[in-house]
Every structure is written in structure tokens, then in C-alpha cells.
Amino acid sequence: MRTFVISDAHGYPELIKNALAHGGFDPLCDAFVYAGDLVDRGPDPEGCIELIERYAAEVLVGNHDVGVLLDLPIFPQESRGSGLRLFLRQKVLAASSAWRVATAVEGVLITHAGVSSHYDWVLQEECQGDPARLAGLLNATFVAAVEREPQVREWDDHPILSEDGPLWFRPRPYSYLLPLAGRAQVVGHTPPIPELEPLDFYMIDPCAFEGMADPGRYRYAVIQAGCVRVEEGRLGCDVAGQPLSKPCLAEAGR
């Protein structure tokens, strides 16, 4: 089975459709994990939500989603996102199929921003090197934070909400930290840094800040048999400039 990982559509459903179409995603035999940031920048976060509700097996939240969820002013932030606050809270606190901050697929750790070297000890000592246990710990800590609704001033020292946590982390040269050692990761949040792929840190942010002047572009990862590959490019477009979808994803455009 293949697992598609897509992130950072930011209100542009095309970034999800294009990735699934390019890879020939088949919901009958493939899985899809969405790795955060549905809101802000683009005009149609509801369209992004419709796609992930239909196709994603797991949904992770990103820092922009949490900005809406906990009423945190971040840049850029679109006013329409505030209307999704109750929806996001319900999803995060759902008893089953909850939206989370981390998951592990075939030994590969998936989060929105990445897990930093700050967590090396936690993975090895508290979780015995098991990425699934680390994901469970991160998720439990996140849910507890959402239930408590911490003030912004408390975020700096919070293990999930701080700049070193899996919602906000940016690796060198943006911070002093490197990715968690010895564990493959697929992440969004930060524009790709190719030099980090040899560290098994695979970055799939499609750079929604560039807009959709190129309507067929995509960037995503596929996990299969414990290996990760990143795909980036653009679909062929018809004369109207609309992406040409593959047949198995025809319904995604309806």
C-alpha cells in the first residue's frame, strides 16, 4: 500500500487535487495523510476540508489551523478562518478519528513542522525508539493543551506549542536545531531544504505563498515499504488552464 502525504494547501484545494491526481491516488488501495494548514492565504479552505474529509485516512493540524483553534494572531491570517474555530475544536477533541499533530506510517514520523533534536531523549528514553509511541505522546499533550486553552504567553515553554514543537519547528538555518536523529520524517511548514533529505527529513510544503498562477503544480510525498520519495512538478493543463486529473481521481473535481 502507498501512503500519500500532502500539506500546506492553505485554502487552495488544487494543491491537494494535483498531488493526488499526479500520483494516481486510488482510495480503494492507497492511504492519504494530510499534514496540516488548511486555512489562510487561499480563498477556499472549505474546499480543502471537503477533500480531506472525503479522502484522508488521517488529518494532522498545522500552526495556522491551531492559530484559528486557539485564537492566536499569526501572519498571514484570513478573517474567514475564524468561522472554522468550532469545527476545528470538534475535530481535535473527537472521541474517534480525531485530528492530531503526529502519526507514524511504516516507521516514518509525520507532523506538520517536524520533530526537532529537542526530542532525541524523549524518543529514545521515554518511547524506546518507537515513533508510534512518540506520536501518541505528542497527540496526548496536544489534546490536553486544547482542552485547557493556554494563554499565548504560555506557549514559549509548551512542548507542543513552542517554536521547538512539531507545529512551529524550523530546522537550521532558521533555528539552532536539527531534525530528530535516526528517524525518517515527512513534514510541511517550511519551504524545502534539499540538504536535509540525506538526514531522512523530507519536506513537502508546496509554497502556497506563491499563489496559483501555475494551476497544475504539486509537491507531496509517498511512503511505501518504509521508504519515502518526494514528487514535485506540474500537471499538464487543458486550454482553459485547468489541471487534467487522472481517471481514478475524477470524483475529486466534482
Range-by-range predicted roles:
Residues 172-231:
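Conserved beta-sheet core of the metallophosphoesterase superfamily
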Residues 108-177:
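Active-site-proximal loop/helix segment associated with metal-binding centers of metalloenzymes
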Residues 2, 6, 11-87, 91:
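Core catalytic region of metal-dependent phosphoesterases/phosphodiesterases
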Residues 1-4, 103-110, 198-199:
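Beta-strand-turn-beta hairpins that frame and shape the catalytic cleft
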Residues 10-14, 40-43, 64-70, 116-118, ...:
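Active-site environment of divalent metal-dependent phosphoester hydrolases
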Residues 60-61, 65-133:
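Flexible, acidic/histidine-containing loops and adjacent segments that form or flank the divalent-metal
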Residues 5, 59, 108-117, 185-187, ...:
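Short hydrophobic-aromatic micro-motifs
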Residues 231-242:
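Short, solvent-exposed aromatic-acidic interface loops
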